[in-house]
From Swiss-Prot:
UniProt key word Cell membrane: yes
Cell membrane found in the keyword field: yes
Membrane topology listed for this record: Single-pass membrane protein
UniProt xrefs under InterPro entries: ComplexI_NDUFA9_subunit (IPR051207), DUF2867 (IPR021295), NAD(P)-bd_dom (IPR016040), NAD(P)-bd_dom_sf (IPR036291)
UniProt keywords, alphabetically: Cell inner membrane, Cell membrane, Membrane, Transmembrane, Transmembrane helix
Cellular compartment(s): Cell inner membrane
GO cellular component term of the entry, any: plasma membrane
Protein name: Putative NAD(P)-binding protein YbjT
Predominant localisation class: membrane
Organism: Escherichia coli (strain K12)
Ranges annotated as spanning the membrane: 440-460
Amino acid sequence: MPQRILVLGASGYIGQHLVRTLSQQGHQILAAARHVDRLAKLQLANVSCHKVDLSWPDNLPALLQDIDTVYFLVHSMGEGGDFIAQERQVALNVRDALREVPVKQLIFLSSLQAPPHEQSDHLRARQATADILREANVPVTELRAGIIVGAGSAAFEVMRDMVYNLPVLTPPRWVRSRTTPIALENLLHYLVALLDHPASEHRIFEAAGPEVLSYQQQFEHFMAVSGKRRWLIPIPLPTRWISVWFLNVITSVPPTTARALIQGLKHDLLADDTALRALIPQRLIAFDDAVRSTLKEEEKLVNSSDWGYDAQAFARWRPEYGYFAKQAGFTVKTSASLAALWQVVNQIGGKERYFFGNILWQTRALMDRAIGHKLAKGRPEREYLQTGDAVDSWKVIVVEPEKQLTLLFGMKAPGLGRLCFSLEDKGDYRTIDVRAFWHPHGMPGLFYWLLMIPAHLFIFRGMAKQIARLAEQSTD
């Protein structure tokens, strides 16, 4: 029977997949997250998208009205700082809202737990979140899982990037720790099927795949499936020595997320899924098969609204490119109108060229010409750009009037990138955000990005400020 469901953390990796699955089954979904634009563009049936910041959830009680089930998929691993405190505060806010507006049940996707004296910050945060949610006087089903094998799973992408980017793998000793990796498809089935088995009291289930594998065995299986042969030599390196800088040059996964995950891999994390399989039987997918389907799924990454479903971007994508995009940008507040900002942004490549640091843009173009890469020059005469237009070596791939203009990177570099100009009306003011997104091709692509970061931050800051200044002059 269709339910009215609130998904908290709907824009995340699991959230996006879960919302699609629930939509296909005819449930009425309220998808809530801080950033829901990408999900909204999918225009899924029976799905309404709502911006919610659970650090200040003023609108959460209203969203809880008439809700049957809440999925809690929120975590703060990628936020940096004291994410334990952040996760506790989010859980407290949700608990308080549920006390005010109760629902029939809450399903919380958590992590497998190590013994208390062996827990990492990530595992402690997950446990604290569960304990707080259980104080809401609502039946809580906590579903604990270890490594999830699926496109976009941070743990999987760290492993993938290490195999693709390093000629020799020298992981710390935790590589011998064992776990029970589960395919994304199996995990989603459990999450959805729990709707048909509502809880009347708190309960905890553990989800597992069909195999117990050490991380070393997972690396070996991945190399066999992908055809990437690498030496794997574990070394006695404490995980606390793994720096953010090191992670920045071996994986496209956000380094704070990657480090938090790795800190939790020091001990065996084995699931006992006996109770869950008795309640919800299904065929569990073998690790190798899950890896094959995941690598196939990753080929579709660029065929998305972020890239305007552009055929050229899709053709340029390579399996070795990092799944997660590195990004750098700058946001400016302005009194200028959206119309004025949009008009200025559309002048890119014209009289104002790139608004700031034009000598640096020219230098970058000369570097391409020096290696024999010919770049187009010029832009259309019309005032407003259209999808498919060329702006020098860039290609316009997304045009959302008074909201977003996205250009496909056309210069020579190890990876695939785009440059986005995003506008937003905040009521008393507007914002202009200038931001580059980069999917690196192996370690050369990661080093290229790190070398360009200082210039990017300097240029994008200047571009955003100059666009705002020109728009304010036009508005006045």
